[in-house]
């Protein structure tokens, strides 16, 4: 029979083992959005810019790029090629919208995603019959290697600063359209919403349908700075989650301060973008490997039973 001290040490050791077991399943699935500020082939071809972009992208399982203005369709293939050469982060694939906009200036939405973790199940350009959006959302339904969350829908939007309120209220209709089309509640709205500072006052922000309607969680909270310049402090870029299951899997949300992480000066960072990427982490790792997360009580019992059996006289 264990002595009291020995038993306590054994309990302590098994508790540590339990934590290690739980931690081994604690890797997360990261979804990001990044306004890459007028991304062209000329910009991507600059080595310092390309290197930094690759390091930013390699942190994400799914990335939605905005302000891709490359009409030659060569910038993303170059970026994708270098991303797939970077360490063991890949393989990545891409899925792009058409060029969008009302004038000669047009942008694309581009999804970059780890193809062994996610795949595009379906996608469509929102039918903006009332022409409320300057760049209508390019909605994408992803299948995930997860039994916890087999699929989710992403709805990106880069608003125009002069019509932020109109576009963000119309984004609720896009949510309803996508949710109804694919019969899912697990939807993420994300992108450069311009949802702060002079583009959208706090009062107007709080009156948005996406703020007053129940069921939406603004993961990138008000007050988080998503801008690179030291002279600005605005929460322009947002990620909004809908769906109880999806929200229950949220483990973190942040703006990624890439200048600080990569040791860049402000000017060096501005060569990349004047925005930080924003990101959410979802706890899908057990399911990514095809295994459901074990119940905490089950883990405790499996670890403690060998210790408790002698104490309870259960040993034959």
Curated annotation (Swiss-Prot):
Which SUPFAM superfamilies does the record cross-reference, listed alphabetically? DNase I-like
Q: Which PANTHER family match?
A: DEOXYRIBONUCLEASE, DEOXYRIBONUCLEASE-1-LIKE 1
The protein in question is named Deoxyribonuclease-1-like 1
Q: Which family does it belong to?
A: Belongs to the DNase I family.
MF terms from GO for this chain are: deoxyribonuclease I activity; DNA binding
| Catalytic site positions | 107, 158
Protein's UniProt keywords contain rRNA-binding: no
InterPro entries this protein is in? Answer: Deoxyribonuclease-1_AS, DNase_I, Endo/exonu/phosph_ase_sf, Endo/exonuclease/phosphatase
UniProt lineage: Eukaryota, Metazoa, Chordata, Craniata, Vertebrata
Q: List the disulfide bonds.
A: 197-234
- EC class, as a word, reads hydrolase
Q: Which PROSITE patterns match?
A: DNASE_I_1 (PS00919)
> Biological process GO terms, please?
DNA catabolic process
Which residues have a glycan attached per UniProt? 271
Main localization category: endoplasmic reticulum
Localization per Swiss-Prot or TrEMBL: Endoplasmic reticulum
- Known Pfam families for this protein? Exo_endo_phos (PF03372)
Q: What is its EC number?
A: 3.1.21.-
Q: Where is the signal peptide?
A: 1-28
* UniProtKB keywords: Disulfide bond, Endonuclease, Endoplasmic reticulum, Glycoprotein, Hydrolase, Nuclease, Signal
What do the Gene Ontology cellular component annotations say? endoplasmic reticulum; nucleus
